[in-house]
Each structure stands twice: as C-alpha cells, then as structure tokens.
Amino acid sequence: MNSEADLFRWGLRTPRAAAIAGILFSLLLTASMFLIRTSIPADPLAGATDVINHSKRIALALNMLPFAGISFLWFVGVLRDRVGKLEDRFFATVFFGSALLFLGMIFAAGAVAAGIIRLLGSGSLMGPGVYALGRIGIYQVMHLYAIRMAGVFMISTSTISLRTGIVPRWMAFLGFALALALLLSNGTINGLLLVFPLWVLSISVHILIDNSQGRPETAAGSSTE
C-alpha cells in the first residue's frame, strides 16, 4: 500500500516538474537566440570578424541548446500527460513529429555553427565561400524549416487544446494566430522565432499555476487512474 501511495504522489509531482522544464526551455532558447543575435551580423554574407570577436558568447549560446532541447522534451511530456486518454492518434502524430523535427533542426543548425566556430578559433584556413555556405545553411535551417515546424507544433497543440480543454480557449486561438505568422514568415523579420519560446512560456506558466491550484479532472484522468 505504501508503495502504491508513493507512486501516486510521484505521478502528481511529475507534471509540475515538466511545466518548470517548459519555462527553462523558454528561458534557455531565448537567451541563446539573444546571444547569437547580438554577436553575429544579421546578413549571412557578412564577414567572419564579428564571429571571431564574439566566439565565447556564441559558444555559450550553442552550449545552451542541448539543455533547451531536453527541457522541451519534458514540456512535450506534460502536454501529453494532461491530454491523457483523450489523445487522438492523428493529432498526436503531428504533435510528436513536429516537436522532434523542430529539435532536429535547431540541433543541426547548432552543430554546423559549432563547427564553424571551432575552425575559426583553431586558425585553420577557411575560405570565404565555405564560411558563407555555412552561414547561409544555418540561416535557411532556422528561418525556413525550424520556424515552420514550430508553427506546426503550435497548430497541433492548439487544436488538441480546443478538443480537450487542457488550456483556456483564448490561449489556443492565440496559438493559431502566432503559428500562422510563423508559417507565412519569409525570414525577413528578425527575431520572429522568439514567438515560439514565449508561447511555450505562457503555456507552462498556466500549467504550473493550474497544478498548484489542484489538477483539473478534464483530460488528465489517465495519470491518476
């Protein structure tokens, strides 16, 4: 009996921990993007002088990305936990797929950026064409692919929210509007990707407050049964 009670209490604590992880993801990704934005010229064809001068700041930003990704996985976990037995296979597939693709995109961009920093810092010869190709590749991955995967994740999450009531309806409709902006983005608006971590932050704060006031019965029955 004691063992069952301990497992029950642990199950109630897990969503709260995941909600905090969503906040950590938002803070880490925002900080990483801010450091990169203030250290690297916006023009992907610009020279490497600023990159070399701010290599330590850029390295710090890149080291934040894996921890942001881990926190994002916990955030995905708490959303699924709140949906519980109401989970729909179709929307769950889009939900998981877009989340994993988004993480894959930012990790790939981070890996290429880390390689460029490593080569520039080691004194190895890197032609301007190779550097420009790396910069353009990173820019395209983040502003063409990752940003749209973030939009798809927001749409699937907002749709699930409307069907299950895991977050307020106004928050779901806000997610649709912001996702549309990400999907239609042509990459000319600097910092538009920051919309995604800020949206995750709002969802996580709501879940954290909701858990502190007592978990709702709707959509969460699978964790307590």
What spans do the regions from the language model cover?
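Hydrophobic, aromatic-enriched alpha-helical segments typical of multi-pass transmembrane helices
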Residues: M1-E225
